[in-house]
Amino acid sequence: EYGALGYFVPRHSWSDNGKYMHDYYKDQPDKKLAATNEYVEFMDKIYGYIAKGLSATVYTQWTDVENEVNGLYTYDRKIIKLDKERVKSANMKCYQIPLAPAPSK
């Protein structure tokens, strides 16, 4: 499990006060760019684990929920919070990495 690249998007969250939400990119001028860059960095690390035998990962979480803004989409599902094409490209690289050989018996 990996992820939690959260930032607050006003008028698209469960609560607009953001009082209890962690906004990891609040000081970044371009939150979408900063979050996307970090996602790509996560994927760069995952590639190395695939070569060593990793077979699955789970991103947490797909959408923002009540008091958490860690989603790839906002709570109302109207805004994609990361650069869709860069995320797709990073994900597709997983299919190009040779899998580790199965352990011998």
Q: Where are these predicted regions, by residue range?
A:
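Substrate-binding clefts and catalytic carboxylate motifs of secreted carbohydrate-active enzymes
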Residues: 1-105
